[in-house]
Amino acid sequence: MIIEGKIIKIAGPVIIADGMRGAQMYEMVRVGEQKLIGEIIELEGDTATIQVYEETAGIQPGEVVESTGGPLSVELGPGVMGSIFDGIQRPLELIREESGDFIARGVDAESISKEKKWTFKPVAKVGDKVKGGDVLGEVQETSAVLQKILVPPMIEGELTSIASEGEYTVLEDIAEVATDKGDEKIQMLQKWPVRKGRPYVDKLDPDVPLVTGQRAQDTFFSVAKGGAAAIPGPFGSGKTVTQQQLAKWADADIVIYIGCGERGNEMTEVLTEFPYLDDPKTGNPLMDRTVLIANTSNMPVAAREACVYTGITIAEYYRDQGYDVALMADSTSRWAEAMREISGRLEEMPGEEGYPAYLASRLAQFYERAGRVNTIGTTSDVASITVVGAVSPPGGDLSEPVTQNTLRICKVFWALDASLADKRHFPSIDWLQSYSLYVDSIEGWWAENVAADWRETRDQAMILLQKESELQEIVQLVGPDALPEADQATLETTRMLREDFLQQNAFDDIDTYCPPVKQYNMLKTILLFHKEALAAVGRGVPIQNIVALPVKEEIGKMKYIPQDEFAAKCEEIQAAITKQCSEA
């Protein structure tokens, strides 16, 4: 039943309508003569408070508000992958054809083409007992993604018919299931409410790392598949480039990139770069396994909340098909600011720094939809969603509410430091402030796939970096020459760790991605230099002789050695370290 109310008050993106008795919380509505998209966020008697996902200028009291009878939902099916959407899943390319470079108000574009035909290959057979999550057939959506057409959750019964191999639109019936409540026809298109998490059987321990090819993240502060990581940092510290690197190189099957309230130029960079980047694993365009959701800072604030939920719902859809998904949200602070603005318009009691009291629970709702799970269905797959959220604290203040509430939920914290960025140390991850609570759980994977002593090597390097900060305090008081020569050797090693290992050039063809085995061998080589340097100092060799060794230059160039030549070159460098330190 369609309910029609009338606008009685307008306050920016918040509208109050009368005559809405019978409407439901979070129901989607059409506002005014231009049919703007909105969502009911509060109900009291006959009046409904609506947040509008489009610009409300020009709307007048007395205009009609129509309910749609359902919550804000996304369309899921073939055609999602490789698309560029706005915050409420309208395809930006179609909108540009309709209304030009700026999104016209009330524009309605189909999220997924209803006319395009897809080649469907059936997998299930008539007579099979099926339930939610079972695979009915397959569609080659892009060169990189084989989409599995699943039985929607909540449907269970006997398959009475299934389409033969051929071309179908997403609205054509491809199967019919006889359930206890009658026959259910199934299409390739599914709709799902964005605020409701898709079901799974159970969550698993996150014990497999998400390999990103970035040395600082992989070796020292790993995130596990199904984990949640936060990247807080002030302006200009490299949050966006760090997230773009993860989107390009992380070993996830699917990447969802949400630009939530960020500068238009940054999203433009992503939109222009990604379609021309090749996926390192398949050689296909990276866009073939990426969904971009662009919601720039000049778009209506209410849509920021929607874009985060839209992104995580699309991620869950591909997770249900057995894929590992990486979701980048840049930045959750802008979403929190949108919540603060709408909360203020609703005249709610403010919490810390004006943010609403429910800030923590909203952040938790989002991050807790990450996880490594057993998917629903007769044959359960292991799949994951890894969430990486950027946080933009004003002035780089990590004690502000969004950062602190995010830290309570995320187990990985990559703190970006403006002073490191000013020194052109990128990625500017502060190794003293950052941490990962997944190191213990993923240690077994590294021992099995890279080296048995990976943890020991990593911890040894971390201890040296922490010791450097203690020694630097003394150096600033009395200068480096006053230190014992063994400590001077330690400072030389930590300089190499910082400059030759932690620094990584995102724009260099070779250094942009560093495989785990190469990371381990680079670290092992630097620590071998440390061991041999200490031994030489113990024999009475002056520290100046060790600092001047030619092999140091070779160690500095290790990051630029191509992968196929690295093993042989690494052995040469290690032999040269031992030889030159013994002859120094």
Curated annotation (Swiss-Prot):
CDD domains in alphabetical order: ATP-synt_V_A-type_alpha_C, ATP-synt_V_A-type_alpha_N, V_A-ATPase_A
GO molecular function: ATP binding; proton-transporting ATP synthase activity, rotational mechanism; proton-transporting ATPase activity, rotational mechanism
Pfam families the UniProt entry points to: ATP-synt_ab, ATP-synt_ab_N, ATP-synt_ab_Xtn, ATP-synt_VA_C
Main location: membrane
Keywords from the UniProt entry: ATP synthesis, ATP-binding, Cell membrane, Hydrogen ion transport, Ion transport, Membrane, Nucleotide-binding, Translocase, Transport
SUPFAM superfamilies: C-terminal domain of alpha and beta subunits of F1 ATP synthase, N-terminal domain of alpha and beta subunits of F1 ATP synthase, P-loop containing nucleoside triphosphate hydrolases
Family named by the database record: Belongs to the ATPase alpha/beta chains family.
Quaternary assembly: Has multiple subunits with at least A(3), B(3), C, D, E, F, H, I and proteolipid K(x).
PANTHER family for the chain: H(+)-TRANSPORTING TWO-SECTOR ATPASE (PTHR43607:SF1), V-TYPE PROTON ATPASE CATALYTIC SUBUNIT A (PTHR43607)
HAMAP family (UniProt xref): ATP_synth_A_arch (MF_00309)
Protein name listed in UniProt: A-type ATP synthase subunit A
Protein's organism: Methanobrevibacter smithii (strain ATCC 35061 / DSM 861 / OCM 144 / PS)
